[in-house]
């Protein structure tokens, strides 16, 4: 009898331990790696710029990063919602990072969909340093960076994700 009770208690202890470890891992805020910060992007004018310099440009401001592409139907469906967020959050910098297949397609998509904000082209593509180190598995992808340069929302894949508005209101 006591062996059965001890076995049950041990199972409970192990289950609690697994839960604690899982929650502590998930609770850790993710930050951009050195590899991601050093990835080279292109400006609308075609100049090369490293990602850390882009973040430094907007330090002291809240940044909403939208990783998207003109060929991505979910990205395009989300644009009206992103535009609503822009209207509600005039003090937020909207940084659009494109994964279009070519610079020409990227430039066309900006004009076609009338996207206002700061635009950069991820020349290294989906498998480049930036995308691979942020665990990019779907676009659109939204990341929010606080005025101190820390990621406060690591992953949202819909512009109407309630966490986006909640985080923006809190900053």
Which role does the model predict for each range below?
Residues 1-31, 171:
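Bacterial Sec-dependent N-terminal signal peptides
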Residues 28-57, 118, 166:
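N-terminal "domain-start" segment that seeds a small globular fold
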Residues 31, 87-127, 136-139:
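Conserved segment of the thioredoxin-like fold in thiol-based oxidoreductases
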Residues 61-63, 67-71, 138:
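Short pre-active-site segment immediately N-terminal to redox-active cysteine/selenocysteine motifs
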Residues 67-84:
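Conserved redox-active cysteine motifs that mediate thiol-disulfide chemistry
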Residues 70, 102, 150:
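Conserved Rossmann-like nucleotide-cofactor binding loop
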Residues 115, 122-169:
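Thiol/disulfide oxidoreductase modules built on the thioredoxin-like
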